[in-house]
Amino acid sequence: MSNLTRVLVVDDSALARMVISRRVSLDPGIEVVGVAFDGIDALEKVKNLRPDVVTLDVEMPRMDGLTTLSRIMAECPTAVVMLSRLTEEDAEVTIKALEAGAVDFFLKPSMLDKGGLSKAIAGLNDKIKMAAKVDISRVVRALRSGMPYYRGAGSFFPSSAKTGGLPLQKNVVIIGSSTGGPKALCEIVPHLPRDIPASILIVQHMPMGFTRSLARRLGQLSQVEVREAAYGDKLKAGQALVAPGNYHLVVGGADEVSLNQDPARNGVRPSIDTTMESVALHAGYRCIGVILTGMGSDGKEGAAAIKKSGGRVIVQDEPTSVIYGMPRSVVECGFADKVLPLSQITQEIVEMCKTRAANSPWRELDACGT
């Protein structure tokens, strides 16, 4: 029994509680230790039952999912997987929940679709088992010591005034993330200066609709312009484009973005590898790749392409990663130039861009031993 993942299912729908708890408990590696009908009930049961993982509905009476999550993380920190509907409102709340400490989220399946339900529950079980492996103390540390969000007006690049606010030389920063990524992105992107001499591409493993909410949330917090990428967008310094869910984002001639639905890579679409490889081919040594927290190895091949083109790769370190799978895959292959805690990554991006703005190619720096 000690090897089982102990789960508390929280949902205001009696049907959802019954179906989810019964289906999840069919997995031999999972034990459903209880169910709760709202946030107040959930708080009491989290404290009494001490589950490894809580599945938490977004919309509930008396105490909603976001408030319940905040209370759980403050009073009895536990790995939480949010259950969200594919609606704009739920997507907005889910993004905030991932900032507030939720480990992951899962699209809530229809309780009446028996055919799709079995497949969906299998996916939920995978999320539950992954969440159980998370060191929740890392999440708590990130919540307590995370950098404050701001919309500062400061400039790190005085020379940009000569170019109407945008630098002449343009780097391309590609940030890839998965599990734990939204919280990490909210600690990096808001601190990038508005006149950074780089265009930024963000690839976060998320479904369609949720990436739009993520872009909107980052835009609310940031100095740079942030929005979901659209076909035909142009790379522009001081702008961050988020790859839309279910589409690969690639960059071609004339700094133009295109989207496609080619087969998933590493089981995901959008793929970090796909975006990084296209940018490495297009921008060469002007690439800066950033690999953040996430499961699996997406980004490893992209990092290899960036290194081959003469670019640089920054990787989030293990202590600040919710899941160290993607960063580890890059580090173990020797593709990481810098392995840094989350709090230092923004400054490293800025420093690399400063170097490029000063017209000093990486290869010349490396020859000097810097």
Question: Where do the protein language model's features map onto the residues?
Answer:
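Conserved acid/base catalytic micro-environments in cytosolic active-site loops
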Residues: 2-8, 14-29, 35, 40-41, ...
